[in-house]
Amino acid sequence: MLVTISGPPGSGKSTVASTLADHLSYEHISGGDIFRGLAEDRDLTLAEFNELAEEDPQIDKDLDRRLRETARGRDDIVLESRLAGWMAGEYADIKIWLDAPMSVRARRIAEREDKTPAAARAETEAREESETQRYEEYYAIDFDDITIYDLSVNTARWGPDAVTDIVLDAVDAYQAERDEGPTPIENVRYQF
């Protein structure tokens, strides 16, 4: 089974995906870890690398191609990134969307990255705007359209363990033979 976990920064994607993968004994593949690793390889901050990605479309496209190829060729994985649901597309068995209000996400990011909530919020808003524009430009993806997801969870309402339990319940209840087919993802340009 291929499960995707998507959502904006600070929504709890990595936490839930890691715990879910452990529970299922699946491999956890994180697009964010790959992206951060590429930034570190160049001795750039995440903000600096994101700016570079704005100028060099191939950075995003290489990462997204890897996600799509992973989804096409692998099983028993939890694939986690902002675009995991979109890139996995028809190959995903279950696509999960996690979200929380910006104030909650900014606080989480501030705690994780040892910065003020105001700084985290400003950086996150700029990053989201930049990435949303790039997704539209490169792939014709409307990032605000969450209808491609099978389950959406507001992670501000429950703690990480409870969110993981909600997702596990959905995964456990999934029966491929009763599935009416993959959620159609139309008009996306998978050109890398």
From Swiss-Prot:
Its EC number is 2.7.4.25. It is an enzyme of class 2 (transferase). GO terms for molecular function: ATP binding; CMP kinase activity; dCMP kinase activity. It catalyses: CMP + ATP = CDP + ADP; dCMP + ATP = dCDP + ADP. One of its GO terms (cellular component) is cytoplasm. Gene3D superfamilies: P-loop containing nucleotide triphosphate hydrolases. ATP binds at G7, P8, P9, G10, S11, G12, K13, S14, T15. InterPro entries: Cyt_kin_arch (IPR011892), Cytidylate_kinase_dom (IPR011994), P-loop_NTPase (IPR027417). One of its GO terms (biological process) is pyrimidine nucleotide metabolic process. Belongs to the cytidylate kinase family. Type 2 subfamily. This is Cytidylate kinase. It comes from Halobacterium salinarum (strain ATCC 700922 / JCM 11081 / NRC-1) (Halobacterium halobium).
